[in-house]
Amino acid sequence: MKRNNFFWGSMVLVAGVLLLLKTLGLFTFNFWPVFWAIMLILAGVWFLLGPRLFKADMIEEQVTIPLEGASEADIRFNHGAGRILVNSGNLGGNLLNGTFTGGLEKEISRSGSSLSANLSMPQRVLGVAIPGVDFKGFAWNLTLNRDVPLRLHFSTGAGESVLDLSDTLVKELRVETGASATRVKLPMRAGQTRVTAKAGMASLEFSVPQGVSARIRLDTGMSSNKIDTNRFPLTGSVYQSPDFDTAANRVDIEIEAGMGGIDVR
């Protein structure tokens, strides 16, 4: 049985039982608040147990995306739940390769010398990888071409993202995440890199390689902020390396967050 069929079938079953009891006059109060409460409970149970009960449905798809002569690339990652692991390597004529548990939907386009890739979880997938539980969840494990200038956009939901971009040529990095943990090693040889992060109730950790300067601007609500002020002293409302304006390799970081933790080191 497919995960979606089981989940939505359970929802319809509960609604039908409540309507039957209402019709038989077994209760006279407004059952809709009860219905939505039960729906939330079922959804919670589903998120906790669904991936374990239906692991047989999970497939591992091996994907390679060729550069096709492109000299730079934009990649958007739409990863709703689970774990995403990113590193880099010598891939020759390929932009990336990797393993995508749960399948992958991709859209590839080319404009001049630039390649654009939009990578998403399949729409049929429903589930969440829970930290600390021993199952693969919806795991993406991929390698990026270390020698191609990149613009990356990560849109993630619940789960964990571990992004080792230290040996890449990432020029622009955007991270948008919800209730998750995100750890990023920033580029050490990309020249200037612009980083924009927006987070809800999330943990964000950015590691700036030694020899790379940084400027950090924060717009945070109730988050806990931890910035290495020995490397990035506070000047006014900005944390900045003393040599930021003249550094050959530098990262310009702007973070907007609600609740959670921000760590830049």
What are the residue ranges of the model-derived segments?
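Alpha-helical transmembrane segments and their membrane-interface anchoring/capping motifs
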Residues: 1-265
